[in-house]
Each structure stands twice: as structure tokens, then as C-alpha cells.
Amino acid sequence: MIGGLFIYNHKGEVLISRVYRDDIGRNAVDAFRVNVIHARQQVRSPVTNIARTSFFHVKRSNIWLAAVTKQNVNAAMVFEFLYKMCDVMTAYFGKISEENIKNNFVLIYELLDEILDFGYPQNSETGALKTFITQQGIKSQHQTKEEQSQITSQVTGQIGWRREGIKYRRNELFLDVLESVNLLMSPQGQVLSAHVSGRVVMKSYLSGMPECKFGMNDKIVIEKQGKGTADETGKTGKQSIAIDDCTFHQCVRLSKFDSERSISFIPPDGEYELMRYRTTKDIILPFRVIPLVREVGRTKLEVKVVIKSNFKPSLLAQKIEVRIPTPLNTSGVQVICMKGKAKYKASENAIVWKIKRMAGMKESQISAEIELLPTNDKKKWARPPISMNFEVPFAPSGLKVRYLKVFEPKLNYSDHDVIKWVRYIGRSGIYETRC
């Protein structure tokens, strides 16, 4: 599938090169350097076709990873491999940098030998790789037959993401519901578009081979499966949630999710992403922005912006930032705000208003007088939207964790012996209001 894999530094020098197919020549290395890394204009597309050769590339810091092929391949699978390769390297030697790659090039070649077989991705689970590739990239010569059989069963068996014999003095399980809410609202307060992208990230430090069961809202409606509509969700309030699409970690038993709407799995060791989802129905919008812009002649603007928090008074939003755009011919700005600090940034053509914390069901406002330089340009100011950043301690989609259970029959510890933590974090994505 993948004809070759190349890792470049910011100058276009090849740090790692591995060719899997005879149809990929040395000229492919130079073609990517000239047409992508040294291109006069920034290459925005992650896929570049040069002389009937496709280059799938990602960039981490100043390092380029490029997968090359001349075949019609599954692009999503290639990018999944590239991002997984980045995660594996980060797990082994930390930050992906030129120095770290040069210091660990033997380890990287060893990883590629295990992860890719003739260009086909095989095993990219960090936990499984670490059982037979050490931190220094040197395989142990003193493995017993029992240890070797454990490695073989882990790599080829059904539970390749977790090794046997894991032991912890204290069994802990951390679950984070991380959501990004995106909004475009009209000046009159009408929602033009809104969606939430969410992830369920877990950190498991559990002994043995535990069975975990994770339950969400009383009712989950998967829109694309046709098992419910938005009306059903609205009737039951936030006891239910309508999900447009979702993907799971390979450890999840999908059959149980389809029948019971519960997530059952044997967890990998350490940190991993259990679930990723997207929803567009019944979103809780944490803030509403009410703008008022009034033109006073041709050389003055009066701006008033009110923000209202739309969540429980017991909750606190943090890291609030409102960016109010100003015209290019702005000469001066006078700002008065009820709460927080506001400053005009000429380099960004915007008034930046920052509030450290804000409780639910509160409102605050900012007023500004903007002085404008006379201009001969008859074109009216386009009035870019007001954008907002924030962080709230709840899930804007309404997703709730109802239960999180752990069973380990062999080691004889129960759900009550496990320390469990659940955290909700909602952040702004592209959160804009037209003015």
C-alpha cells in the first residue's frame, strides 16, 4: 500500500528513509523537497500529486513525515498511520525534533520494521510495541520461551493493545470528556450554524486484564442509523443526546454498543482516546454575545458588546477572551469595561477583552469609542464577526457519564477498589457572532 516513508527536517534533508516498493525511486525524495518543502507558496493540501506519485504528508514542529505511493490507496488509512507513527515516536523519545530523530534513528527503523510490513500497517499500539522494543531500541537476548509466547499472543491475538502481567499498587481510572463547541450567530441572535466535536480520553492504571463498562446518557440517538430523531431528544431533555457520528478505539466491543448503548472494553494501559463524536442537536451554548455598532459620521464608531453566560450559577467559566474587530483606518480607541481588562491591539486590528472567571447566569459589557482616519475608500467596512474563547466545566453537547464500572475476576478486585475520576471540559472552537 505505502511505497515509501521519508522523514525530513525543515531544510528538506532526509533524516529517515525506508522504501517498501520498487516503483519508488530516489527522485521521489527530491520531488517532495522541491515541490512541497521549498515551494514558493505554502502548500495547504495534505496530499500532493507529482508525476503520478502521491505524497501524503503531515508536519510536526519543523519535521515533515511523508508517505509515498503510486497506487490508489485509502487516504484516511495512510493519515491514520502517519499520526499514529507520530504518537509512537512521542511515546518513545518525547518531542519530535531533528535532534531526537538523529539520536534515535536506530529505534525508529526498528519501529518501522514492526509497524509496516511491505507497506501495510500491522501493529501501531505503543503498549504492544514496548513489550519487544525497549526504550533504547535494543531487543533483549534473554527472553524465555514464556515471555516470547506472551509477545506473540499479544501481537497476533485479540488483545494486542494490552500486555499481560500489569500490576499497580493502587488501581486508578481517569476519564475526561473534552468538547469543542463551534458557533456562528447572526446579530439578531439567530443560530446560523452550531456543532460540538467531542473526545472521551481515558488514563487507566489498572492491574491485570480488567473489563470496563462505561455508560452515558439514558438515551443515545445515532442520527445516521435512523434509530431516532431530534424530536425524541428534545422531549427527554438532556437525559438523551443525539450523536451525528462517532468512532471508537479498537478495544471497544461494538456489538454491545449497538444493542445496549454501553461501551464495554478491555482498556489499554496508560492514556488513550476511547471515543470521538460529533453532534449538532440541542447544544448548550455557554455564552451569548450581543453586539451593537453605531456609526457616528465618517470618523467615529461606537461599539457596545454584552456577553451573557448561559449555564448554572454554581459553575465558573475561565480563560474568557472576546476579540472585537476594528476598521483598518482606526486611529485611536477609548475602552470602558465592567469586568476584566480590555486593550486595543493595533497590530491585530482588534480590541481584546479578557476576563479571568465568570459565573453562570451573569452578564458583562464593554463599550468603546473608535476614532477613524479620513479615507477616500468608498467601500464600507465589512464588519468581521466578533470571536470568543473560553473554557467551561461541563459538556456543551449534554453528554453525561452515568456509570463507570471495572471488573477483574482473576486478581479478585472489584469496582469499589478502583479510584475513579471524571472531568468535563468544554472549550470554544470557532465561536463567532456577526455584528
UniProtKB/Swiss-Prot annotation:
Keyword Glycoprotein in annotation: no
Location (main, coarse): membrane
Gene Ontology biological process: clathrin-dependent endocytosis; intracellular protein transport
UniProt cross-references to PROSITE patterns, sorted A to Z: CLAT_ADAPTOR_M_1 (PS00990), CLAT_ADAPTOR_M_2 (PS00991), MHD (PS51072)
Disulfide bridge positions per record: none
Subunit structure: Adaptor protein complex 2 (AP-2) is a heterotetramer composed of two large adaptins (alpha-type subunit and beta-type subunit), a medium adaptin (mu-type subunit) and a small adaptin (sigma-type subunit).
Free-text function comment from the UniProt entry: Component of the adaptor complexes which link clathrin to receptors in coated vesicles. Clathrin-associated protein complexes are believed to interact with the cytoplasmic tails of membrane proteins, leading to their selection and concentration. AP50 is a subunit of the plasma membrane adaptor. The complex binds polyphosphoinositide-containing lipids.
Entry protein name: AP-2 complex subunit mu
Organism this protein belongs to: Xenopus laevis (African clawed frog)
